[in-house]
């Protein structure tokens, strides 16, 4: 399981850079980043090397941030590998709310995704031979 930080940002210029600068100044390294937006606000989702420091720093800088648990997978870097795992989830009535990838090693990609039933997702993926991170 992976713990992500979700940060709500006002949908205007400079918000993402201000958030990232606060983290930089605190010495927090970002492993992955995803931004989703609506007309009024954006959600910056990050994976860091130190969530405790990141959350404390963000809150002190008046950013609305929370920690969210995700399923993390290491997926072979080959055609169809992710598709096969998504089919397993679908066949077990597990919905993926959102997903993003980040750098992997040794010929593997890393995937993080949110679902309503983390334990069920992990269980069915492990039975299918997936490597949970």
Task: Give, region by region, the residue ranges found by the protein language model.
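A conserved regulatory-domain signal marking ACT and ACT-like small-molecule sensing domains
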Residues: 1-133
